[in-house]
């Protein structure tokens, strides 16, 4: 099945791909959509070159090692998603509306997840509500491709 992006946790790429395409060094510490950015950049230049197969099997060995606190992940997802959106997609009214709608949907889903999975961490809801504001306060930096304001908080 042809695809516009491939998850790199189970993706296979030819070695020569890495001579032309690279992971963006703005993404730090934890895996959050850098695979989307990497593989989508391949798709943009070589459409019909990415495939996924439903027959592929792999084992995801979950571990707590290297996981970041939920609060940090909330802000990371908001900042990195805006970065990808601004750098990979046309700024049409349709795309902007779809992006905003998807962020709103994710906000609702994540609030429900917190209420169900982490009822003792209900304060995380405030982080989910503030993360889009944080992104807008730093919008010009994100648009310029400078994520240092956020990445320095990860070290």
Locations of the language-model features?
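A short, conserved alpha-helix in the catalytic core of glycosyltransferases
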Residues: 5-21, 27-56
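Short acidic, glycine/proline-rich loop/turn micro-motifs
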Residues: 24, 62-67
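Short glycine-enriched, charge-decorated loop/helix-capping segments at active-site entrances
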Residues: 27-29, 67-70
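Catalytic core of nucleotide-sugar-dependent glycosyltransferases
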Residues: 58, 68-95, 124-145
């Amino acid at each position: 099945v042809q695809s516009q992006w491939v998850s790199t946790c189970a993706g296979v790429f030819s070695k020569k791909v890495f001579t032309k395409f690279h992971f963006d060094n703005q993404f730090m510490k934890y895996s959050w959509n850098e695979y989307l950015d990497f593989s989508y950049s391949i798709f943009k230049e070589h459409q019909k070159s990415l495939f996924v197969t439903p027959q592929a099997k792999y084992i995801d060995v979950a571990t707590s090692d290297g996981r970041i606190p939920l609060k940090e992940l909330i802000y990371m997802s908001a900042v990195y998603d805006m970065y990808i959106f601004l750098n990979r997609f046309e700024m049409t009214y349709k795309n902007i509306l779809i992006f905003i709608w998807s962020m709103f949907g994710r906000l609702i889903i994540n609030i429900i997840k917190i209420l169900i999975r982490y009822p003792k961490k209900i304060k995380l809801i405030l982080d989910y509500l503030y993360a889009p504001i944080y992104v807008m306060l730093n919008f010009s930096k994100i648009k310029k491709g400078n994520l240092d304001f956020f990445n320095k908080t990860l070290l």
